[in-house]
Amino acid sequence: MAKKVQAYVKLQVAAGMANPSPPVGPALGQQGVNIMEFCKAFNAKTDSIEKGLPIPVVITVYSDRSFTFVTKTPPAAVLLKKAAGVKSGSGKPNKDKVGKVTRAQVREIAETKAADMTGADVEAMARSIEGTARSMGLVVED
């Protein structure tokens, strides 16, 4: 018989830097999960990814307090900021432009995000990423 799912916990944790401090500790502690076991497994799985990049993770907690987790690709906004070389997006994206990204960079980000995004094809996903870039105050160039 399959294990009974107790809860799903969604977090964003920096790649290779999971530790028992908030937000990881309290979120998993409430479910009775072995926090250090999760931290070691997560850090091992994300050691090939650039350290410090926020990685969304969905942790499935079972009734016997065991768990499994699925890592996703970093948020599009984080990848866009990295590509444009800016620290944060614009507070007034329609007035103040903070950086530039090329269509090639946008397409590359769309290909990276393809596993997690719903879209007909890479072009549709690239248009979605362009919209995110514009809403952050980034200019998309050809």
UniProtKB/Swiss-Prot annotation:
PTM annotation, UniProt: One or more lysine residues are methylated.
GO molecular function: large ribosomal subunit rRNA binding; structural constituent of ribosome
InterPro entries, A to Z: Ribosomal_uL11, Ribosomal_uL11_bac-typ, Ribosomal_uL11_C, Ribosomal_uL11_C_sf, Ribosomal_uL11_CS, Ribosomal_uL11_N, Ribosomal_uL11_N_sf
Protein name: Large ribosomal subunit protein uL11
Keyword Cell division annotated: no
Source organism phylogeny: Bacteria, Pseudomonadati, Pseudomonadota, Gammaproteobacteria, Enterobacterales
Subunit: Part of the ribosomal stalk of the 50S ribosomal subunit. Interacts with L10 and the large rRNA to form the base of the stalk. L10 forms an elongated spine to which L12 dimers bind in a sequential fashion forming a multimeric L10(L12)X complex.
Function of the molecule: Forms part of the ribosomal stalk which helps the ribosome interact with GTP-bound translation factors.
